[in-house]
Amino acid sequence: MSLNFMYITNSPTVAEIAENAGVESIFVDLEKLGKEERQRGLDSVKSNHSVQDIIGLRKVLTKSKLLVRVDPIHERSEQQIEAVVNAGADIIMLPMWKTVEEVQQFLDYVNHRCKTMLLLETKEADQCLDEVVRLSGIDAVHIGL
């Protein structure tokens, strides 16, 4: 087993430095829905990244994968995922999922156009994980973040 390093940034300059230092994935964090409420009172960082940041990073990265965390499944997920794919993401991460149906919807929206990663961070997700990992199109599961 090997470690894969990720670095969260929307700065092309910082991303180039990280890539040259061997970081495998440059991470753009678009997750905003419900995040303030979930993390209220915690000493956590909330990124202010955008789809435009993906485009800027795509121009400078040559080795590192471009990983983008989107919002949990919601009424505009299809449009958000479409924009992220079109901007050049290599991997799309789905956070805060709780059901097999949410994961299947995510996979349908991505439609094999890039790699997929599930962020395992809820009790409900853990309870249906055995069924979820049988779905076609999941490339990775990340535990916690």
Predicted regions and their residues:
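Glycine-rich beta-to-alpha transition loops that act as phosphate-gripper elements at the mouths
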Residues: 6-12, 68-77, 96-97, 119-126
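Short, ordered loop/turn segments at secondary-structure junctions
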Residues: 30-33, 71-72, 97, 143-145
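Conserved anion-binding
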Residues: 63, 87-89, 94-145
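Glycine/small-residue-rich loop that forms an oxyanion/phosphate-binding "nest" at active or ligand-binding sites
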Residues: 62-95
